[in-house]
Design a protein with these regions (language model features):
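Extracellular/periplasmic helix-loop junction at the C-terminal end of a transmembrane helix
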Residues: 51-79
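Alpha-helical transmembrane segments of integral membrane proteins
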Residues: 2-35, 51, 64, 78-173
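Residue-level signal for discrete positions within transmembrane alpha-helices
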Residues: 1, 5, 41-44, 48
């Protein structure tokens, strides 16, 4: 049904946006550093791996071997909210992996652009630390583009969750 698909798409977009903000800001703060190289490599891999294959691998590893998540099925939100989150977490993580490549690049470039603005020089003159200035000013200025891209990707996810829903036996579209 559509509500399950929408819930999964919103959950996956929120996860992708949170992870991409952390990795994108860390990459932009030290271009060419370890975090930058690792995150760029991971986003290339995440974009290249088919979602249904990643779903099967994650299901075998995290659900069957480790038992962290249910292997398949869905618990309605009205019946058990915690069970619903638990049943949608692994599919949302798999869907988020496909979206991370674009979002990390968008966050990284937006933050790097914001770090070059003149108001960053003013924050140094005021005596603010780079981390404080980044959290206070840079994030506010640079998150509009990633949020816009995430909204567009969420619309794409609503139509593209069919294979993942089938692998995880979710009653979606």
């Amino acid at each position: 049904t559509l509500p399950v698909t929408l819930l999964l798409a919103v959950y996956a977009t929120a996860v992708a946006l949170a992870v991409s903000c952390v990795l994108g800001v860390a990459s932009a703060m030290r271009p060419g550093g370890v975090v930058d190289v690792v995150s760029r490599t991971l986003m290339q891999l995440a974009s290249a791996v088919p979602g249904f294959w990643l779903a099967v691998v994650c299901m075998l590893f995290f659900a069957a071997n480790l038992g962290w998540f249910p292997v398949s099925g869905y618990v309605p939100l009205t019946q058990d909210p915690a069970g619903c989150v638990r049943s949608l977490t692994l599919p949302a993580l798999v869907l988020a992996c496909g979206e991370l490549g674009v979002l990390i690049r968008t966050v990284r470039s937006s933050v790097m652009d914001a770090l070059q603005q003149e108001y960053m020089l003013a924050t140094q003159v005021k005596g603010l630390t780079r981390m404080h200035a980044t959290v206070t000013y840079v994030l506010r200025a640079s998150l509009s583009a990633p949020i816009t891209v995430a909204g567009i990707q969420m619309a794409k996810l609503v139509g593209g969750t069919g294979a993942i829903e089938r692998v995880f036996a979710l009653p979606g579209l």
